[in-house]
């Protein structure tokens, strides 16, 4: 990645800069499967091998206009980019190409409203050509039990994102507040659908531009109480996503909402110990529409709470208790509740710390979890280690 700074002018707080450069990327991918009866012999069927080369050449011109006065900042970047991407299958000699010229502006503005309150506004437009791992004719082992194949044209994404935020900082009172909102419009040149056959997953693609829209609101409040030596933080997220996907070869509109709040409290006031509690509440909802008719409505609600307490019995001897509580349920009659309890002792002797812990005292042996996405519902059963004891030694020199 090389660039040349061809112009740089400064006048007081105003600065203009232009850069001319070229960026190149080269990726090589080779994959195959071995014969299970003889690991030294590779299976060479076309559907089981990949031998691909991917190259992208991107010449560009960056024009940046910035203004800085005290804490007010303004930065406008207007890059002009040309993309020449080629992917070649060295087994068949076939090539996939993509060429375009794009204008991808970026705007960042920071305005201090008071000595403690600041506002930020940002906009970005970006074009991305997906890499070699997003399109391949042969199957690839994506995890220990899933094979995936996607033989589409080169995937391209065009993103527009607008965001704004307010930040309040008062270190003397120990109060920090942040609010952020973000709107994104993502345009793709492929409409995707996954088909499943036991462990095989094949991605089908239709060459059609489609859009995904998302809107997020995020808030963060943190307050430290000096006298009580207590810190409280609250995080909340509200998100809405709408997109189009192929389900059973039928165009399906997907609408999802995410609501989450996290509360964390830490107390360090007492000489005999301290404690920490983290609570997370989440409610998600997904709706699917075909031909403007609702075909699915999935809702799920989860609670997760973690509580830790430490007791300092002497200057060298301490004990701790750790609990985890999970409660998950949804409209598909899935309901799981779990309670975990751990207990530990720690003793410091000269340069050695000795720690003994008993984990999973409640002796849970199976953990059931459900994964709900925009259009899929999956349930997992994990076998976990029953109640057990462990001793650790820590040495310091």
Language model features with spans:
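Exposed, low-structure sequence patches enriched in small/polar residues
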Residues: 1-397
């Amino acid at each position: 990645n090389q660039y040349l700074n061809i112009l740089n002018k400064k006048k007081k707080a105003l600065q203009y800069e232009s850069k001319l450069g070229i960026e190149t990327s080269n990726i090589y991918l080779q994959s195959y499967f071995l014969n299970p009866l003889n690991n030294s012999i590779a299976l060479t069927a076309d559907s089981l091998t990949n031998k691909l080369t991917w190259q992208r050449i991107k010449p560009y011109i960056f024009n940046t206009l910035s203004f800085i006065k005290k804490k007010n900042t303004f930065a406008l970047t207007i890059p002009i980019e040309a993309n020449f991407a080629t992917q070649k299958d060295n087994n068949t000699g076939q090539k996939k190409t993509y060429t375009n010229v794009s204008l991808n502006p970026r705007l960042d503005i920071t305005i201090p409203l008071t000595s403690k309150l600041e506002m930020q506004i940002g906009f970005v437009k970006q074009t991305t050509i997906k890499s070699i791992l997003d399109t391949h004719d042969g199957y690839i082992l994506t995890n220990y039990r899933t094979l995936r194949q996607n033989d589409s044209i080169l995937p391209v994404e065009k993103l527009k994102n607008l965001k704004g935020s307010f930040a309040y900082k008062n270190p003397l009172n120990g109060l920090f507040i942040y609010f952020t909102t973000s709107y994104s419009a993502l345009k793709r040149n492929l409409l995707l659908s996954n088909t499943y056959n036991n462990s095989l997953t094949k991605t089908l693609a239709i060459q059609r531009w489609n859009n995904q829209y998302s809107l997020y609101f995020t808030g963060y409040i943190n307050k430290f109480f000096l006298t009580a030596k207590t810190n409280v933080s609250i995080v909340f997220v509200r998100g809405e996503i709408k997109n189009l996907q192929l389900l059973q070869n039928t165009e399906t509109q997907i609408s999802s909402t995410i609501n989450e709040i996290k509360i964390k409290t830490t107390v360090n006031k007492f000489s005999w110990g301290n404690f920490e509690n983290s609570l997370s509440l989440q409610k998600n909802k997904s709706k699917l529409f075909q031909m403007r008719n609702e075909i699915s409505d999935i809702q799920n609600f989860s609670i997760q709470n973690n509580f830790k307490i430490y007791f300092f019995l002497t200057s060298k001897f301490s004990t701790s208790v750790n609990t985890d509580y999970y409660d998950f349920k949804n409209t598909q009659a899935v309901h799981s509740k779990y309670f975990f309890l751990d207990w530990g002792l720690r003793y410091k002797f000269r340069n050695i710390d000795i720690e003994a812990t008993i984990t999973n005292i409640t002796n849970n042996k199976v953990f059931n979890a459900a994964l709900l996405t925009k259009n899929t519902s999956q349930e997992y059963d994990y076998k976990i280690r029953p109640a057990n004891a462990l001793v650790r030694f820590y040495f310091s020199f």
